Amino acid sequence: MASIGPATTTAVKLRSSIFNPQSSTLSPSQQCITFTKSLHSFPTATRHNVASGVRCMAAVGEAATETKARTRSKYEIETLTGWLLKQEMAGVIDAELTIVLSSISLACKQIASLVQRAGISNLTGIQGAVNIQGEDQKKLDVVSNEVFSSCLRSSGRTGIIASEEEDVPVAVEESYSGNYIVVFDPLDGSSNIDAAVSTGSIFGIYSPNDECIVDSDHDDESQLSAEEQRCVVNVCQPGDNLLAAGYCMYSSSVIFVLTIGKGVYAFTLDPMYGEFVLTSEKIQIPKAGKIYSFNEGNYKMWDDKLKKYMDDLKEPGESQKPYSSRYIGSLVGDFHRTLLYGGIYGYPRDAKSKNGKLRLLYECAPMSFIVEQAGGKGSDGHQRILDIQPTEIHQRVPLYIGSVEEVEKLEKYLA
């Protein structure tokens, strides 16, 4: 058996007496410093047998870093407001767009509260009127539209708004040169409200039209000149012109998903602070996914090519696994699941709805902008959604959106 030399014995005693986390009242960093200094009073052989002071400091440094990381993840949160200010400081967006987005987030908080209290506040059921699409307006549709419009007006940075619930675009400011154009669906999936199923708000923001200035001296605001009418019509821009887009989902938690053209970020409303807190960064949709989200109740009204596609998803052959079906009936809810898990969401044209049901300007285009920023694809079955030039505010188009491979697979069937 090998004998233990005096230097080694000294080293062992030194380690146990000085660098002992269990018995010492000093912090790990203080122990390490004391331990390292003590080495200089011993012979070289002793120092050689004692653990390296450099390794000691490295270990303490790593421990400190881990502790700091744990503390940061537990106590340091990044709110939507703080995140927007960082983007502004980095030059990604300007101060006016920051204000507009903050106003939209405020509207979403108010609508979230209304949705949660809908049954208590008697906001369920039908309003008794129909919107421009001929759909029965729910009470909460009307209230949500007022909330959204009011928040955007109060921002002082919004020139024109276009909503699902408004017949025509509305000029917000008397002079809207330099102010943003905001299109939105204040409450998507409102037919689900009575059953407490997920709903959401969708929005898109376009750049201001610097050539449009409304004359504030009009006695009758409804009488617009031909030039002013042209400015209002300029709301009809292709989705490729979008500066920002997002949606807010009102479900088991309230989630605000946003892109400003630099990736997709998700913020969750913390009920304790009343703030949207950053919870997901640079979201990427899977390239493929075995989930499809279609309303198969309309199957008989689809064309044969789409029927063939759907049949092959459900019965792909002996060597492949069939796709799973998930359908909520709320674009925001179905899209959010598709964004996270991959797959495809579709609302096709059929014998009853020649161009589908979803609106291009304030539903399909914003969602397609988001999915492309996440690495996915949005299509009408033949062309990119963001390339389509709207001809009217409430224009409808078929929508197929989700993982790139899944959307391209469908396009081959429809070609």
Swiss-Prot record:
Binding positions for Mg(2+) 3 per the UniProt entry: D185, D188, E363
Disulfide bonds: C231-C236
Localization annotation: Plastid, Chloroplast
Any matching Pfam family: FBPase
Further remarks about this protein from its record: In plants there are two FBPase isozymes: one in the cytosol and the other in the chloroplast.
Protein name, as recorded: Fructose-1,6-bisphosphatase, chloroplastic
Keyword Magnesium: yes
Binding residue positions for Mg(2+) 1: E135, E164
Region Involved in light regulation, residue ranges: 207-232
GO CC terms in record: chloroplast; cytoplasm; cytosol
Subunit and partners: Homotetramer.
GO biological process, one term: gluconeogenesis
Pathway: Carbohydrate biosynthesis; Calvin cycle
EC number: 3.1.3.11
Superkingdom to which the source organism belongs: Eukaryota
Top-level class of the enzyme under EC nomenclature: hydrolase
Molecular functions per Gene Ontology: fructose 1,6-bisphosphate 1-phosphatase activity; metal ion binding
Keywords: Calvin cycle, Carbohydrate metabolism, Chloroplast, Disulfide bond, Hydrolase, Magnesium, Metal-binding, Plastid, Transit peptide
Swiss-Prot/TrEMBL catalytic activity: beta-D-fructose 1,6-bisphosphate + H2O = beta-D-fructose 6-phosphate + phosphate
Cited InterPro entries: FBPase_C_dom, FBPase_class-1, FBPase_N, FBPtase, Fructose_bisphosphatase_AS
PANTHER family hit by this protein: FRUCTOSE-1,6-BISPHOSPHATASE-RELATED, FRUCTOSE-BISPHOSPHATASE
Cofactors: Mg(2+)
